[in-house]
Structures are given as structure tokens and as C-alpha cells.
Amino acid sequence: MASKEIVSNRKALHNYEVLESLEAGIVLTGTEIKSLRDHGGNLGDAYVAISKGEAWLLNASIAPYRFGNIYNHEERRKRKLLLHRYEIHKLEVKVAQKGVTIIPLGMFLSRGYVKVRLGCCRGKKSHDKRQTIIAREKEREIASAMKRYR
């Protein structure tokens, strides 16, 4: 079954260099899932913290469900990520390196469950960002030139 992306963190790919990525489940309430299906999420300031052998998604904004009642969820609450123990240990080792952090790259639906795509990332400097933009534009020019001369 195909997975459907519902929230993406496009700014993360601009500001960070992704070293490694993996998928994790997430513990959500019913109104959070309904809100995410309406594309009511934002991962702009979100990051992952590991404490006491558990991974937590912090600062991820899921808009309150518009048809929710008094039991609606908090917008920026701490959400637990579902990972195996060895995956959490691997992430802890990566984060121990200088300048590496764990950023959510996107959320998607897979078989009715919401999954989070995580990335071990290192921050880019401004000149690295410029080099990435220049390389992307060169690839675009080459592709258009190849398309013209076929």
C-alpha cells in the first residue's frame, strides 16, 4: 500500500544536510489524527529529544481539530515516538557527535497509521546553502538543454 505524505518540513532540507533517515511511529490522540488528515500540521520548529531511553517529538504543531469538543488536544504537546531500543541507541550515538541533531522531515500515512520520517542532520553554513542552490540550478539547466536537443 502506498504511503501518503500529509506534512513535510521543506525548510529542514534547506537548512540541514541529512546524514541518515529512518521512519518512526508516533503516539497520537484521535483529534490529532483527524487534524493531520486535514493537513493541519507544521514541523517548522520541531526536533527530537531522547530522554530516559525514549524518543520524544517536541515543538511539532498539530492544529486543533475544527470539529473537536472540549477534549481537543494541545497544539504543541510532547509526543512519544515509537522506535526499537537499538534504533534509539543508534540515534543517541549520532546525536553525541558535535553538530548533529534529529529533525522530523515529514509525516505520512501508512496503512492508516501516522509515521514520522526522521533525519540525523547537520546544520549547513550559508555558503553551503548557496552551493546547493547553484548545483540545483545547473542540473535544471542541463535537463532543459537535453530536453530541447532531443
Swiss-Prot record:
Top-level taxon in the UniProt lineage: Bacteria
CDD domains named in the record: SmpB (cd09294)
Keyword check for Zinc-finger: no
GO CC terms in record: cytosol
Keywords attached to this entry: Cytoplasm, RNA-binding
Family: Belongs to the SmpB family.
Protein's UniProt name: SsrA-binding protein
Species whose genome carries this gene: Chlamydia abortus (strain DSM 27085 / S26/3)
Gene from which the chain derives: smpB
